[in-house]
Amino acid sequence: AGGGALFDIGSHILDLLYSLLGPYAAVQATLDTLIRQRPAAAGSPELQAVDVDDIALLHLRTAGGVLGSVEVSRMGTGLTNDLQFEIFGEQGALRFNAVEPGWLEVYDVREAGSPLGGMRGFRKVQAVGRYPGQKAPDASMAPDFVRAHAECQYQFLRAVVEGRPAKPDLADGLHIQAVMEAAERSSAGGGWVQVEEDEHA
């Protein structure tokens, strides 16, 4: 039946982290199906076997040597369309939660640590979209999934009109596809698996 939670949900967080941290080099993954049967249709008493993952746990290494982990699940009781990430570095950290898309939490180690704790700590920074050449939607509009999709379409059409390559492009999509396929191989065979780009060339 193809991919489950990894392909459906994981592709988005993998793409987002790719744009922030660069290409992936290797992955170690566990994919599992916790609910083995589901109704054939909403309200149907007939059950059908589930043959795709509903949870995926990935350890990743980027080409630049960054290590990280990604958890993707259809099993998050009480969650809606949550997407969160945390990135920790030597000089600071970032936290983002798509439930509050207008804010990015930033920690800067250069902030004074004294007296009495100083100014250290995570700060919320406004993360409204102010993009070069932006016409609509206006930056004053609350960020959400619809606005993000509209901005993607606008930037693509703008690239076409200006005669330049659009980003992300097909190669970026193929890279994420290669990462997910490497995750499937890792889950099936165990251990770390290199991301093989040439299989889609």
Name every feature range the model reports, one short phrase each.
Residues 185-201:
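C-terminal capping/lid region of NAD(P)-dependent oxidoreductase domains
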Residues 156, 173, 190:
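Hydrophobic, well-ordered secondary-structure elements that form the walls
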